Amino acid sequence: MSLYRDEGVVLRTSKLAEADRIITVLTRDHGKIRAVAKGVRRTKSRFGARLEPFMRVDLLIAEGRSLDTVSQAESIAAYGAAIVGDYAAYEAANVIVETIDKLVGTERERMTDQYRLLIGALNALAKRAHAPQAIGCSYVMRALALAGWTPRLGTCVVCGAAAPAYLSIASGGVMCEADHTTDARRIAPSALGQFDALVHGDWTVLDAAPVERVVRELVEDWGEYYLERPIRSLRLIDS
């Protein structure tokens, strides 16, 4: 049984048997993996608390046929401890881990940029760097942009005209009055500016005012369209 070492962020866990857990982790070098953490539900477990959601850990893993097994786990950053004490941050963290979990398959494909974006977002939540809602919404748009779904927001996707007044999720960006499709929704300049700031992580804009409801709805709809399934945690952050 071969061993490999990597660092990663725990996305979610599920119970297995009486004392074990299956953990889903986005790693730096091996993409998303699922591994068995044996005995972690026992009170005397060596590393149970290190393998909770939102924790960044250094792992030694034994490769298996269907599931790997965690042999060692050392904490790198305990984001979870800082996040769970703040409900708004906890909601945003759930949006973040649900998004990356649904975005990334388990093909062990290395995706360093996605990993860096993930730890950056969780670190910002833990440090209260910005409003949790803005961090969560910006993460969704930036993660999808890294996957190739960046909205075109400067000029009409049909004719290239400036001063667009509509946004079509299916068409991938903004549209002018003359060329907008039936699915396109009218968008005010202020909302378009916030949406663009979420895509590019422009915190000067995002720190100036709370994210508008219409913009949060755009993030939710954009995510559902391109992931082909809803990000359910976003519905809570928007309520």
UniProtKB/Swiss-Prot annotation:
Signal peptide positions on this chain: none
Keyword tags: DNA damage, DNA recombination, DNA repair
A family per Pfam: RecO_C
UniProt-listed SUPFAM superfamilies: ArfGap/RecO-like zinc finger, Nucleic acid-binding proteins
GO BP, sorted A to Z: DNA recombination; double-strand break repair
Cysteine disulfide links: none
One of the record's GO cellular component terms: bacterial nucleoid
Top-rank taxon: Bacteria
UniProt record similarity statement: Belongs to the RecO family.
PANTHER family: DNA REPAIR PROTEIN RECO (PTHR33991:SF1)
Summary of the function given for this chain in its UniProt record: Involved in DNA repair and RecF pathway recombination.
The protein's name in its UniProt record: DNA repair protein RecO
